[in-house]
Amino acid sequence: MKVLASVKRICRNCKIIKRNGVVRVICSSDPRHKQRQG
C-alpha cells in the first residue's frame, strides 16, 4: 500500500472511500493500486 499526500484513481476499477476519517483507494483488479492518504 502506498501512503501518499494526494490519492488518485489509477484505473477505472479503483474506488475512493473514506474509512475512519482516512481517504483510501481500493482496487479490485490490481492490488498494487491500493493507496492511503497520510
Curated annotation (Swiss-Prot):
<keyword id="KW-0687">Ribonucleoprotein</keyword>
<dbReference type="InterPro" id="IPR000473">
    <property type="entry name" value="Ribosomal_bL36"/>
</dbReference>
<protein>
    <recommendedName>
        <fullName>Large ribosomal subunit protein bL36</fullName>
    </recommendedName>
</protein>
<dbReference type="InterPro" id="IPR035977">
    <property type="entry name" value="Ribosomal_bL36_sp"/>
</dbReference>
<dbReference type="GO" id="GO:1990904">
    <property type="term" value="C:ribonucleoprotein complex"/>
</dbReference>
<dbReference type="GO" id="GO:0006412">
    <property type="term" value="P:translation"/>
</dbReference>
<dbReference type="Pfam" id="PF00444">
    <property type="entry name" value="Ribosomal_L36"/>
</dbReference>
<dbReference type="GO" id="GO:0003735">
    <property type="term" value="F:structural constituent of ribosome"/>
</dbReference>
<dbReference type="GO" id="GO:0005840">
    <property type="term" value="C:ribosome"/>
</dbReference>
<comment type="similarity">
    <text>Belongs to the bacterial ribosomal protein bL36 family.</text>
</comment>
<dbReference type="GO" id="GO:0005737">
    <property type="term" value="C:cytoplasm"/>
</dbReference>
<keyword id="KW-0689">Ribosomal protein</keyword>
